[in-house]
Every structure is written in C-alpha cells, then in structure tokens.
Swiss-Prot record:
Keyword Transcription regulation: no
Major place of residence: cytoplasm
Gene Ontology CC: one annotated term: cytoplasm
Protein name (record): Ribosomal RNA large subunit methyltransferase K/L
Domain THUMP: 43-154
Role played: Specifically methylates the guanine in position 2445 (m2G2445) and the guanine in position 2069 (m7G2069) of 23S rRNA.
Record Gene3D superfamilies: 3.30.2130.30, RNA methyltransferase domain (HRMD) like, Vaccinia Virus protein VP39
Length: 715
C-alpha cells in the first residue's frame, strides 16, 4: 500500500473522495485542493484510469521543512532519485507555492532541478535533460509556508485532457469540471439527458461515457509512470484489460440513444460530433441544430434532466442578449419539460434569476478564474393551460416576459406612446424614453434609431448591491418586452460620476458608429465604446436654437464635445465656425460630423486645446458663442481646476473680450442649483436671461434640472 494524493478543483474534494472510495481507495482524507488516500498497485492504476474528477495523481516522495533555498536544494539532492528513474529520462519540475525565502515559483523549480541533476552527477551518472514540452517524468513540488512536498506525478499530462476533444467552441468546460457538473446534476443513468446549448458537447460526452462505462483515460497513450522504476506493468495491464472488457460489454448492449445536444452554431455541432466519435459515444448522442427559443422536448413521454452551461459574460455590456437568452430558456424549460429536473451552471446569479425558477439545491465551483454556481431545479409537473399549450406547439422567436417589473414596464409603455409620436413629428431619431421616473428603477432608457441604450445610474451606498442588480436585469427584460428591440441592439451601461478624464476612457473598442437625424442634421453616435454616446439629448432644442441664430455669423463652439452644435450652426448658414475641445477623440468625431453634413470647408476650423487657455489667448472676434463647460474639472491636461459656479464670471469676462458688440453668448451647464452671478455680470457690462425652460424638450420635461441655459449679451 502506498500513500497518494489526487488533486482537483477547489470545491470538488468531497465528490472526489466518494469517487476514489468507489474505486477501492482507503483512508481517504480531504485536504484543500485534493484528497489523500491509500492504494495498492491495482487501485493506484484504477484511480488513474477511471477518475473523472482528478486533475493529477501524485506519489509523495519527500515531506520536509525548508527555510531557505539551500534547505530546498539539500532536501532534493539528498533524495535517492535513481530509485524512481534513471539518467536517460527527460524531466520537468512543476513548482507551486512560496514562502519568505522562496518567493518565485520559477526560482523554486530551478533549485529543485539543480538538486536532481547534481544528485545524478554525484552518483557518477550523466545529467538528465529537462524537457518542458514532452517530459518522461514530472516532479511536482508544493511549498506551503515552510512545508515542502516533492511528488512524482503519475499522470503525466493533466487528467482533464481525455484525448477526445480535437477542438471546441469559444468557452469550453474542462472535462473534469463537466464531469462534476453531471455528477452534481441529479441525473440518473438510463434516463434522458438534454443539453440545449451544448457547444462542443463536453457535458453530454462525459455523461455518456459514465453510462457506457468507458474509463475517461482508456485511450491515453502516455503516462507519468511509463519511465518510473516502481511501475508494475502486470497490474497496469490487468486494470486496463478490465476497463476494455467493461466498455465492450456495454457497447454490445446497444442501448437506444437518450442523450440530446442542441446548439445554434452548426460548426460547433460538427466539432461535438467528432468529439463524441473520438470518445466512443457517438452512438448514444443525437445532435440537432436549433435555437433555444424554439427548443422542444425530444422525449416528452419520458422524464429526465436538462443540463446546461449557457453563455455568461463578465462585462455588463454583454448582458442584454444574455438576459433575453436566460429569460426564454426559463420559459421553454417550464413549457417543454414539466416534471423534469434541470441543472444550470453559470457565473451570473442575476442571469440565473432570469430563469424565473426556484432551485432546491446549489453548488459553488470555479471555471478558470470565474466564481460560478450550479443550480438544480425541479420543474413543476402542473398541467399547462390552453394558452401555454399553444405557445409550446408554436415555438418561435423570443418574446420577453412582460410580467417582469410591471410598474417599470407600464411607465415605459406610457412614455413611449407619448414621446414617439412627438419625435416623429419633430424629425428626431434620438430621444429619452425613461429617466429614473420610479425610485426603484434608477436608470435611463434612450432611443437611438433602431437601438436602445439602458444606462444604470450608480446605486446609493445604502442600496443592497444584489437587489439593485436584480432590478436592473428586470428592467432590461421589461425594456426588451415593451420596445420589441432586437437583443443585440440593446446596449447596457453603468453610469457613475465622472472623475478626471475618465469620460474619455474607452469602455470597448468596437468602432460601431451610425448616424441619427436631428432637425435636418445628421450626427454620428457610438453607443458602445464610451460612457457617453456622442450626443447630449437634453441639449437638442439648444442646438436647434443655435442653428436658427447662426445665419451670416462667425460662430464659436467652446468645450465643443463632438461638435453637434457646430453642425447645426453650419447648416443654419454660419459665415464661419470655430470648434474647440481638449480631446482629440471628440474633435475627430466633430470633423466626421461636419463631413457627414457636407460642411467641411476652410471656414470651419477645429482646434485641439485647453479651452480656457485658448480663450485667454484668443484675438478673434465672434458674433455667436455657444459654451457648455463641465461642472467641475481637475484634468491633468488643464493648467488649473475648474468649477462652473466659482469660475463662470471669469469665463464671461474672457468671452466678452472676443464678443462683437451685437453678439450673443449661449451659456449652459449641468450643475444642479447653479446660481448666476448677476452682480458680476453687471460689473462686466453684461446681462443674462435664463431660457432653461425653453430649451427643455418634451422627453426631458420630467427632469427640469438636467441643465440650465442662458442668453448673455451686452447691456
């Protein structure tokens, strides 16, 4: 009997303990990341051949304390390595862990390697070679604080590499993880197993191999024990013969296929078919191309299990399509699989909530770096209503659940009815449909052509993060239902307070631009790459007013953003336009806006500069100035900080200097509670009239403080 250690992903230790016990292992003890056990030669080989959950099986050689790299080297060089392999082998050291003295795993691996080759030289042997790609022997070193364990890796390559998978889809599951998901799913062998989004088929193949009694490593050609001097060839051949005989006996039973894999991508299904063929279970699995929205139960007369690892995204921006996917998946499960069990694996608790099903059991697991959860469900066996039966028979496109977030959905529907008719009459294609009308749904919904943007406002600190997340997911589901927008044309963003220059930081790099019409102007928008879209919707009437005032005038647009006001001025007949902004990104955007509207002549100047510094040095005169500065800025690219309340009179003084006698300044900002310094204006010889109410469009009438706007002229 010898002591061995089987490694596994964290969270699977107890499951692995049960598996090893069933294979004949004794004295199984769970440890973090694996299981210690005792085994004779046959049980050792049986564990290597049959374990579906082990990542590696290690034979400990040295257990000792080390406090320095010299201790590490000494512990290695003293070991009788010739008892395990000879000098002709190619070997590799895998080193995991650190302590105070050995802080880098590469350094630790190098010291172990040095000790091994020096041992052979001291004993009159040639130095064995290191081979990082195809080693004959793997030495596994594990250091936890000062405790060192050196082991011989009997597996060779990691045991999740079964050998049947040629290639896979975009996000494959490790075979060991897939096996654990199957074992935890509650599926009973001999009953149907359906995977509606099967990808490369790993879940179904692992389950089919279990039922077919095919050892997961039956076809492995190379092992970590091949060059081990303790290898018992007779015991190994006996264990392998038993495995081959068992697989052949099950194959000859010729059971009817009851594993079913569906996927939308026919190319991935072809890979799944090849993988199943390689795994020896092609005769057990039926594959079919199909959309989850049209999923039908392939064996309605039987009861079985639906198992699935649906897509899940780390970035919030990928969520709308996933919300739709999980929502329709939940509907199809309840409609098509009454009385069945379901087991769904995902990294997103919120997405699982979109299934609208209550789980009776759940497990935590890791998929690479992602924290994931597996939830098991018992689908109700209640009789379907005639309406639901009809829906089952007429499966088709996704129809989001309109009964989610009903208060929000009703308000959104009411707003759409009012605003869309008005927008069409006005000739605008970008407008707001909802703006935090209800306190429980703290978000904005904007319409851009055939796209919808949902912007979540950052939740207050006293609001539970999970509750806020769930409300957002519910609101997106309701928005899909109410607007009928295609899922890939709904963009989701989290909006937070701007700090420094982060409004210029990219969220993505899709480069997807399209234009919207606004009172005859065509304006480029980008809904994905930046926090803002390139168009401030609340200033729509202000831009139109600027266009109406601009004919024959020299126009200045300061803090110009993407130059949309400049476009209106140019189309309104401005004699010249000057557009100034600190961001090259937005100036290039402004240039494209002008080109789109055939207003890109020499009279239209674009200047990249710190707006305040440029203004202080400007000698040109203007008839019409539009200035919409930030509320606050301390950007590193600006010489001084800026506060619109504190500094607006200084700004007006500089603007007065370049304003012609009959000129007009249109001044706007977004500071709530802004107070115009009328006394300061009087000292400058200027007067101001507030026109905020006149510049507030219908779609923003619920938010009267979104901006304030003023006409400033000479007294």
């Amino acid at each position: 009997m010898k002591e061995l250690f089987a490694t596994t992903a964290r969270g699977f230790e107890e499951l692995l303990k049960l598996e090893l016990s069933s294979l004949g292992a004794t004295e199984c003890q769970v440890a973090q990341g694996g299981v210690h056990f005792m085994a004779d030669d046959e049980t050792q080989y049986r564990a290597l051949l049959w374990s579906r959950l082990s990542s590696r099986i290690l034979l400990p050689i040295v257990k000792t304390k080390i406090y320095s790299d010299l201790d590490l080297y000494s512990a290695v060089v003293r070991q009788n390595w010739l008892a395990y392999f000879d000098e002709r082998v190619r070997f590799l050291v895998d080193f995991n862990g650190t302590n105070r003295e050995i802080r880098h795993t590469q350094f630790g691996a190098m010291r172990v390697k040095d000790g091994i080759v020096d041992y052979f030289e001291r004993n009159g042997k040639a130095r064995p070679n290191v081979d990082k790609d195809y080693p004959d022997i793997r030495i596994h070193a594990y250091l936890n604080r000062d405790d060192l364990v050196l082991s011989l890796d009997l597996s060779g390559e990691a045991l999740h590499l079964r050998g049947y998978r040629e290639d896979s889809g975009a996000a494959p599951l490790r075979e060991t993880l897939a096996a654990a998901i199957v074992l935890r799913s509650g599926w009973k062998q001999g009953t149907p197993l359906v995977d509606p989004m099967c990808g490369s088929g790993t879940l179904l193949i692992e389950a089919a191999q279990m039922e077919a009694k095919i050892a997961p490593q039956l076809h492995r050609m190379h092992w970590g024990f091949d060059f081990w001097r303790g290898h018992n060839q007779a015991a190994w051949e006996k264990v392998k013969r038993e495995a081959v005989a068992m697989a052949e006996a099950e194959f000859n039973k010729n059971p009817n296929p009851h594993f079913y894999g569906f996927d939308l991508d026919h190319r991935v299904l072809q890979k799944a078919q090849r993988n199943a063929q390689n795994a020896g279970v092609a005769h057990l699995i039926k594959w079919k191309q199909g959309d989850v929205a049209a999923l039908k139960n392939p064996t309605p007369e039987d009861k079985g299990t639906v198992i699935c690892n649906p897509p899940y995204g780390e970035r919030l921006g990928t969520t709308p399509a996933l919300i739709a996917l999980y929502s329709v998946f939940g509907q199809r499960l309840k409609e098509q699989f009454p009385g069945w069990n379901a087991s769904i694996f995902s990294s997103e608790q919120g997405l699982l909530d979109c299934l609208r099903m209550r789980s009776h059991r759940q497990f935590k697991a890791k998929n690479g770096p992602l924290d994931c959860i597996q939830k098991n469900y018992q689908i109700s066996d209640r009789t379907l209503s005639p309406e639901n039966k009809s829906a089952v028979e007429n499966a088709g496109e996704f129809k989001p659940n309109a009964n989610v977030a009903t208060d929000f959905a009703n308000r959104l529907q009411k707003n759409i009815k009012k605003i869309e008719k008005w927008a069409k009459q006005e000739g605008i294609e970008a407008y707001r449909l909802y703006d935090a009308d209800l306190p429980d749904y703290n978000l904005a919904v904007d319409h851009y052509g055939d796209h919808i943007v949902v912007q979540e406002y950052a939740a207050p600190k006293n609001i539970d993060e999970n509750k806020a997340r769930q409300r957002l997911l519910d609101a997106v589901t309701a928005t899909l239902a109410v607007t009928g927008v295609e899922t890939n044309k709904l963009i989701l963003k989290v909006r937070q307070k701007q700090k420094g220059a982060n409004q210029y930081e990219k969220l993505a790099n899709k480069g997807e631009y399209f234009y919207v019409n606004e009172y005859g102007a065509k304006l480029w928008v980008n809904l994905t790459d930046y926090l803002d879209t390139g168009l401030f919707l609340d200033h729509r009437l202000t831009r139109r007013m600027v266009g109406q005032m601009a004919k024959g005038k020299d126009f200045l647009n300061l803090f110009a953003y993407t130059g949309s006001a400049t476009v209106h001025a140019a189309l309104g007949g401005a004699k010249s336009t000057t557009t100034v902004d600190m961001s090259n990104t937005y100036l290039n955007w402004a240039e494209q806006n002008l080109i789109l509207n055939e207003a890109d002549g020499k009279q239209h100047k674009l200047i990249q500069a710190d707006c305040l510094q440029w203004l202080a040095n400007c000698a040109q005169q203007f008839d019409l100035i539009f200035v919409d500065p930030p509320t606050f800025s301390n950007s590193k690219r600006m010489e001084d900080s800026w506060d619109v309340q504190r500094d607006h009179i200084k700004l007006m003084g500089n603007l007065k200097r370049i304003l012609r006698p009959n000129g007009t300044i249109v001044f706007s900002n977004n500071k709530r509670g802004f107070k115009m310094d009328f006394e300061g204006l009087t000292r400058l010889g200027l007067k101001a009239e507030e026109i905020s109410a006149k510049t507030l469009p219908l779609d923003f009438e619920r938010n009267k403080q979104i901006h304030n706007c003023w006409i400033v002229e000479f007294v």
